[in-house]
UniProtKB/Swiss-Prot annotation:
The chain crosses the membrane at residues 3-23. The gene is psbT. The lineage of its organism: Eukaryota, Viridiplantae, Streptophyta, Zygnematophyceae, Zygnematophycidae. It is found in: Plastid, Chloroplast thylakoid membrane. The keyword Transmembrane applies. It comes from Zygnema circumcarinatum (Green alga). GO terms for biological process: photosynthesis. This is Photosystem II reaction center protein T. PSII is composed of 1 copy each of membrane proteins PsbA, PsbB, PsbC, PsbD, PsbE, PsbF, PsbH, PsbI, PsbJ, PsbK, PsbL, PsbM, PsbT, PsbY, PsbZ, Psb30/Ycf12, at least 3 peripheral proteins of the oxygen-evolving complex and a large number of cofactors. It forms dimeric complexes. Keywords: Chloroplast, Membrane, Photosynthesis, Photosystem II, Plastid, Thylakoid, Transmembrane, Transmembrane helix.
């Protein structure tokens, strides 16, 4: 049970970080493409 909780926390943290990076990168690429 503990392993499942740790895995869920790890996946959740990585997901949040990946989501934040993915959401922050597109605008910069779009601005560069428009320019």
């Amino acid at each position: 049970m503990e392993a499942l909780v740790y895995t869920f926390l790890l996946v959740g943290t990585l997901g949040i970080i990946f989501f934040a990076i993915f959401f922050r990168e597109p605008p910069k690429i779009e601005v560069k493409e428009k320019k």
